[in-house]
Amino acid sequence: MKTMTILGSTGSIGTQALEVAAKHNIKVKALAANSDVEKLAAQAKELMPERVCIYREDKKSELEKLLSGTGIKISTGMEGLKEIARMDGVDIMLNSVVGMVGLVPTLTAIEKGTDIALANKETLVAGGELVIKAAAEKGVKIYPVDSEHSAIFQCLQGNEGNKLKGIILTASGGPFFGKTKSDLGGVTVEQALNHPNWSMGRKITIDSATLMNKGLEFIEAMWLFKLRPEQIEIVVHRQSVVHSAVEYEDNSVIAQLGVPDMKIPIQYALLYPERVECDVKKLSLTDYGKLTFEKPDYDTFDCLRACIKAVTIGGNLPAAVNGANEEAVAAFLDGRVDFLDIGRIVMSVCDSTPRKEIKCVEDVLEADRKARERAKELIGA
């Protein structure tokens, strides 16, 4: 029986992964969540894992009451996540937490020799060089869970000996595609959370609205597939049917298509290389009638431009724009800044951060901390 652990089990990706695990007889050995004690406790009672972690330490006593008498070990904070990442007898760890908190547990699991199903973008955005190097040294496989990176990964299967020319990274365009900055001045949180195609958590939905999500995926793709910035083309594809494509040396393009449902990439990552029945709607191209492809608007969406600039410069810049974005999005969701301020803050931090080499995880964390401090100054200004 295959075994797994899940960081972020109460979120959108985590809950769908548990459905996949239940259907395909995968043993779940540990669960972790940020703050949703009741949902985590319900999952734990159903699955009886060896260990659970609630990241918020102030929630521990409530979780202990809910799991009293079960014998399940309970931990908190970063140490709790690392304990799960170090567990013996685990085939794969799904990292679907949100934010920079995902980096250290990923590196810990790699050091243990555990394969990773990666849905936490920040792991590769901020610490890509460290993560890819560590995985190569330990012989650890990283299976992408993002639909776009999963699509690219799938298109590469069986073509390992052929030269990759580049990739086409598709984007839905979010809820504000076709709008200009003058149109977006009064955007509300509710409007930004209304994604046309995907059901996701709040932070990633805002990132999709600002196109920051696509910028983060651009950076991820560079590390996952060993690409240069000029080898990646972003294309807005409103229907979210073509999840991404790869282009080979002979100019042939191979794409992966499917209905917009995260269960497919989750299942592919967890069961690779097997393809088995999946509880998703069958794709009917005739139901769509036509598929459209357009260029993104780099002038309106500052976050996308900031990400590409950051990764082109390299070093600590990707970690900086990521940290600034996390602070800006949190401020927007709390009503402290306007929608357009997110892009302004991210670009300002990108422009004002001097480049430094990343040599260890402490360098990544320092870049993140300094960027957050600067972002908070801009938020409070």
Kindly give the residue locations of the regions a language model identified:
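Catalytic, metal-anchored helix/loop core of enzyme active sites in primary metabolism
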Residues: 1-381
